[in-house]
């Protein structure tokens, strides 16, 4: 029994130990990542640099401590003391040098505040922008490397001596004199306005506007009525109309809206301004303006006006049904026999189709003969004379022979001729007898000759097919265009020959089947397809006798010269450059200060460029003289100082070019000839309008000019409720409650479920949403949906978002939300509309839960087996009746019934056994717990006492360690320690033990501490011990908690590092002299453990020690 209890105790200890929490190492990293200022985008280069960084170094300290382990000594409570070593880790921060790659702008680029790299031009571009390092792109009217020079308005050329000849306010290029057209004009002199599909200066920009839209000067599309979008590509959607599709239609009953003027176009059958009224009886068509013209009391369709004739046909119901036809438009065939024969007297009612029998027939369908098949006559005494194998029947009243298709004659003894077929050969075959051999005597279909097809053999075989009925496929390759429909011979493309078109034309031949001869001069070949002569380099023409024109070269002169400033060789295309240019394509000009054919001559100018062809100096603005070494005199400016300052409205002008430097408020331009651009106003147009997007402002004062529907100082406020239009001056109509008025055009905006000009009508059936413009998407025939949400209301038997899914098995009713109560699919099926159970044969009851009574079977148990039984080896099955017992289906209904009833019984037995097993397990657990507690109460171990001795030379290891205690104590004050051990416990327990009352008080103080840190471990962290104090009373109180901790739960705490070791020491942290860092057991200053005399031991302390040992 004791051995069993020992095993149970060991098992319980393992469970407790495995549940003890572990403590992973905690590292505190105090380095913060610097915010990045590196550039981004294009022109970014990566370089290597050296930076400072920090690394953490781990330092390990050895710790010796006492611990307890499980053993077989019952006198110590199966716990023995052992000495163990552990390690504690700390971390230090070290400075290291590391290589790092950083990003910076490439050479020639600088970094902006937004961290992008832009090209750098030095000196900066004066009248332009820098597009590459050291390269400027000048504004219109300026030139030079840094865009610093320009002729005065209206002049150009050397010395600005030439006058511009431009119109419509255009200026000209100061160097070339070409007109620089303002936006909206083009032509050599800017005399032509831009066509509708162009815009911008010189009309070089294509207008992207479509569908009749036009561009304004800024290139923005102004769409025509019925179109919208940025480029007028979007046709007004249904329900919108007008310019930019700003207005809404209110048409009803599926009418469409003219997207240009908003007029409703009614569907046939409706009329009214909004197509809200149906046509009256007797009228039809769009607008219900047309009157029905049906005869014989027949009605017409309100949409199409088509007459709905029953028993009649014809456009106006004026023609009676032909023999054998009845119903709507006489489209239905009567089923009475004999109608297919012309000599038959059978007929049917034109409206109902009821048969009217001829003589010799009887029955509701007139399909029963009065006489036998070979007899006829009133008394069936006469014998038919028809050829039996060619005859359909012998008329029972007259003996007339009705022949099979393909035969004729009084007795059906004659076959049809080549071109006739059908009953009595009355039908004529429609074959093309030039291409047909015969026709089918029954169907009349034509039998075609090889190479022909079609209903009457009038069509040739399709491409790539040939033979009788075009049944064979041609074997030509991709260079053939088909084959002969009769024999399959391939017809080759031009330039090819051979049985399968696999060979090129021989030399000097071309065309289809290579039948033509080339007509080129001797030694010159021709194209095998067209026959054109293939000319050598430098020649062209039909006979290759014409030289290449200027700008082309090579064979047939088909290559274009690439010489920009020169001419090319007619054969090789090599360029011969003009003076001042060089390079393979003559596109490179002489460098600055050089001119001439080879750019070898130096310009004789002073800090100026010269003509690349003549070497003449081109003086910059503000200079003159042959070498451009003289400055302009006062009151002159421009090229060669030929311009004089003239009076102007400008406040000041540039002394170099006469351009206005300061324009009056509200104007801009080099002569203040333009108003401020949109969005700006004031002096120099430098101030920005404060108006909301889409609203302009006065160029002088900046006052906002609001668009319709807005008001306020910045035009940012919409019109108040009840107002709309310019200045919000117009009153909205009285829209119905819940609807709003459009602040721009004043139209009522209906909420979901309402429609009409004033939103007063609910949505018509089948429509929903705002303005009732959306069609219900329900597939049900009722087309019913919620007028606000469009959610479909499904009829009984259907479900799904569109009511297009039938109910799943076991459910029924509207939206299939009701669950069927039938017994199961083996015995019944459930009606998805009503939920009624339809019992399978052999079952009965409201829910098909019972077998048919004995001796009954079938659907609803309506049939009965013989009263005297089914016989030997047979039985009465509830589903199929009498059956042999070995038959597979015999007894199947009874098996299904028993399976359904047996499932409930097996489920009950399963639950019974589950509960029985749980009860047995619980009883065994209670027995084991009872014997464990009994064994613990029989044990009466001695409670060890603890005494403390100061270590004289090792303050570093001053720590309390006892394996029966749940935390360590550190005593930085040796005097206090000594006084505690010298008997300063008057009237109390010796050696620091507490009385029962003191222990309860101490437990209240420490209540709430972490069980993971104290309750299940022998050691606490050093910081916690130092903060809590080091009295022997606290240590003694701690000894009454957590006797059974394992080494696994203790070791992580020994290796736990202090977070404060990365920074300066904390004011409450323990100095190295107080840390548990000894490696010599002989010098260990820990307390000695001894066992006192049991007689002198306080009985209360003894009882508590005993409880602590096992709990």
From Swiss-Prot:
It holds the Pfam family EGF_laminin. Gene3D superfamilies: Laminin, Tie2 ligand-binding domain superfamily. Disruption phenotype: Accumulation of cell corpses. Appears immunocompromised resulting in susceptibility to bacterial infection. Reduced or lack of association of ppk-3 and rab-7 with the phagosomal surface. Defective in the recruitment of lysosomes to phagosomes. Double knockout with the P-granule component pgl-1 results in an increased number of cell corpses in the gonad as compared to the ced-1 single mutant. Conversely, double knockout with pgl-1 or pgl-3 results in reduced somatic cell apoptosis. It comes from the Eukaryota. Residues 931-1007 are annotated as: Interaction with trim-21. Expressed in engulfing cells and syncytium hypodermal cells. Ced-7 is necessary for clustering around cell corpses prior to engulfment. Residues 963-980, 1068-1083 have a biased composition (Polar residues). Residues 1-18 form the signal peptide. Residues 932-1111 are cytoplasmic. The chain crosses the membrane at residues 911-931. A motif (YXXL) lies at residues 1019-1022. InterPro entries: EGF-like_dom (IPR000742), EMI_domain (IPR011489), Furin_repeat (IPR006212), LE_dom (IPR002049), MEGF10/SREC1/2-like (IPR042635). Phosphorylation of Tyr-1019, within the YXXL motif, by src-1 is thought to initiate phagosomal formation. Residues 118-148, 156-191, 199-233, 241-276, 421-458, 681-716 form the EGF-like domain. Disulfide bonds join 45-106, 71-80, 105-117, 121-130, 125-136, 138-147, 160-172, 166-179, 181-190, 203-215, 209-221, 223-232, 245-257, 251-264, 266-275, 425-439, 431-446, 448-457, 685-697, 691-704, 706-715. Residues 940-993, 1006-1111 are annotated as: Disordered. Changing residue 136 to Y: In n2091; increase in corpses in L1 head. Changing residue 965 to F: Does not attenuate engulfment defects seen in ced-1(e1735) mutants. Does not affect binding to ced-6. Reduced polyubiquitination and reduced degradation rate. This is Cell death abnormality protein 1.
């Amino acid at each position: 029994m004791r051995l069993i209890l020992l095993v149970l105790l060991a098992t319980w200890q393992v469970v407790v130990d495995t549940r003890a929490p572990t403590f992973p190492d905690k590292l505190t990293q105090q380095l913060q990542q610097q915010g990045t200022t590196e550039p981004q985008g294009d022109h970014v280069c990566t370089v290597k640099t050296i930076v400072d960084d920090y690394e953490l170094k781990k330092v390990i300290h050895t710790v010796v401590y006492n611990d307890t382990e499980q053993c077989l000594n019952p006198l110590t409570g199966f716990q023995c003391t052992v000495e163990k070593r552990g390690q504690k880790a700390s971390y230090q921060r070290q400075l290291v040098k590391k290589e790092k790659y950083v990003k910076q702008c490439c050479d020639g680029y600088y970094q902006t505040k937004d961290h992008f790299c832009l090209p750098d031009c030095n000196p900066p571009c004066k009248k332009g922008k820098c597009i590459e390092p050291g390269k400027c792109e000048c504004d219109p009217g300026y030139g030079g490397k840094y865009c610093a020079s320009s002729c005065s308005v209206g002049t150009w050329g050397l010395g600005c001596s030439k006058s511009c000849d431009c119109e419509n306010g255009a200026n000209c290029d100061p160097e070339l004199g070409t007109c620089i057209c303002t936006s909206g004009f083009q032509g050599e002199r800017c005399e032509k306005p831009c066509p509708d599909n162009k815009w911008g200066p010189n009309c070089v920009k294509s207008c992207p506007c479509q569908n009749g839209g036009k561009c304004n000067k800024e290139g923005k599309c102004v769409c025509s009525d019925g179109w919208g979008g940025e480029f007028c590509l979007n046709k007004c959607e249904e329900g919108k109309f007008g310019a930019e599709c700003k207005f809404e239609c209110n048409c009803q009953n599926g009418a469409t809206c003219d997207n240009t003027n908003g007029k409703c176009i009614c569907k046939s059958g409706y009329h009214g301004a909004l197509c809200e009224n149906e046509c009256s009886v007797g009228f039809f068509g769009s607008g219900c303006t047309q009157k029905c013209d049906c005869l014989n009391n027949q009605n017409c369709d309100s949409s199409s006006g088509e007459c709905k004739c029953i028993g009649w046909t014809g456009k106006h119901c004026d023609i009676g049904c032909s023999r054998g036809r009845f119903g709507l438009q006489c489209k239905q065939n009567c089923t009475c026999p004999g109608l297919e024969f012309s000599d038959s007297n059978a007929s049917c009612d034109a409206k109902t189709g009821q048969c009217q029998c001829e003589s010799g027939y009887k029955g509701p369908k007139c399909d029963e003969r009065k006489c036998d098949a070979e007899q006829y006559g009133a008394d069936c005494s006469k014998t038919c004379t028809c050829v039996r194998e060619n005859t359909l029947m012998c008329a029972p009243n007259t003996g007339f022979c009705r022949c099979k298709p393909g035969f004729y004659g009084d007795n059906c003894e004659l076959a049809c001729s080549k071109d006739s077929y059908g009953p009595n050969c009355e039908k004529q075959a429609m074959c093309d007898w030039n291409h047909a051999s015969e026709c089918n005597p029954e169907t009349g279909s034509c039998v075609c000759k090889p190479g022909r097809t079609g209903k009457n053999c009038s069509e040739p075989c399709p491409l790539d097919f040939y033979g009788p009925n075009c049944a064979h496929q041609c074997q030509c390759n991709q260079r053939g265009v088909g084959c002969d429909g009769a024999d399959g011979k391939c017809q080759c493309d031009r330039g090819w020959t051979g049985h399968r078109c696999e060979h090129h034309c021989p030399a000097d031949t071309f065309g289809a089947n290579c039948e033509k001869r080339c007509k080129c001069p001797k030694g010159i070949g021709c194209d095998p397809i067209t026959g054109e002569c293939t000319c050598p380099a430098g020649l062209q023409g039909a006979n290759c006798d014409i030289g290449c024109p200027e700008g082309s070269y090579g064979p047939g002169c088909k290559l274009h010269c690439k010489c920009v400033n020169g001419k090319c060789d007619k054969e090789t295309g090599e360029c011969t450059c003009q003076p001042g240019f060089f390079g393979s394509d003559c596109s490179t000009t002489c460098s600055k200060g050089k001119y001439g054919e080879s750019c070898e001559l130096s310009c004789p100018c002073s800090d100026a460029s010269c003509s690349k062809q003549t070497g003449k100096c081109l003086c910059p603005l503000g200079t003159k003289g042959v070498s451009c070494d003289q400055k302009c005199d006062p009151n002159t400016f421009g090229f060669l100082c030929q311009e004089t300052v003239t009076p102007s409205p400008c406040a000041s002008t540039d002394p170099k070019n006469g351009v206005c430097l300061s324009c009056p408020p509200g104007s801009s331009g080099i002569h203040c000839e333009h108003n401020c651009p949109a969005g700006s106003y004031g002096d120099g147009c430098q101030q920005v309008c404060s108006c909301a997007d889409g609203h302009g402002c006065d160029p002088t004062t900046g006052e906002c000019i609001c668009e319709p529907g807005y008001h306020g100082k910045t035009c940012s406020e919409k019109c108040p409720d009840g107002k709309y239009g310019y200045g919000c001056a117009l009153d909205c109509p009285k829209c119905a409650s819940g609807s709003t008025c459009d602040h721009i055009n004043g139209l009522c905006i209906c909420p979901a479920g309402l429609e009409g000009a004033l939103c007063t009508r609910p949505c018509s059936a089948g429509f929903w949403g705002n303005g009732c413009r959306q069609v219900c998407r329900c597939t049900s025939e009722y087309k019913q949906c919620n007028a606000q949400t469009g959610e479909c209301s499904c009829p009984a038997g259907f479900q799904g978002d569109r009511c297009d899914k039938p109910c799943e098995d076991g459910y029924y009713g509207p939206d299939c939300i009701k669950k069927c109560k039938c017994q199961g699919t083996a015995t019944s099926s459930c009606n998805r509309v009503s939920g009624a159970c339809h019992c399978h044969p052999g079952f009965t009851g409201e829910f098909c839960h019972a077998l048919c009574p004995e001796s009954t079977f079938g659907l609803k148990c309506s049939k009965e087996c013989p009263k005297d039984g089914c016989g030997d080896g047979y039985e009465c099955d509830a589903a199929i009746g009498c059956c042999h017992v070995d038959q597979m289906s015999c007894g199947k209904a009874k098996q299904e019934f028993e399976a359904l009833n047996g499932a409930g019984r097996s489920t009950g037995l399963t639950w019974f056994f589950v509960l029985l097993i749980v009860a047995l397990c619980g009883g065994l657990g209670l027995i084991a717990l009872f014997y464990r507690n009994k064994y613990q109460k029989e044990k009466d171990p001695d409670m060890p006492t603890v005494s403390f001795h100061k270590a004289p030379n090792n303050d570093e290891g001053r720590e309390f360690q006892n394996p029966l205690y749940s935390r360590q104590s550190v005593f930085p004050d040796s005097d206090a320690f000594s006084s505690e051990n010298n008997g300063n416990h008057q009237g109390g327990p010796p050696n620091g033990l507490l009385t029962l009352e003191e222990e309860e008080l101490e437990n209240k103080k420490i209540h709430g501490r972490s069980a993971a840190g104290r309750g299940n471990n022998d050691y606490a962290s050093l910081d916690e011990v130092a903060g809590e104090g080091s009295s022997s009373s606290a240590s003694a109180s701690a000894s009454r908690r957590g006797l059974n901790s394992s080494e696994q739960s203790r070791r992580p705490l020994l290796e736990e590092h202090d977070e404060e070791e990365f920074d300066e020491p904390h004011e409450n942290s323990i100095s190295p002299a107080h840390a548990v860092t000894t490696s010599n057991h002989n010098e260990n200053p820990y307390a000695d453990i001894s066992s006192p005399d049991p007689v002198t031991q306080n009985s209360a302390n003894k009882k508590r020690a005993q409880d602590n040992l096992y709990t």
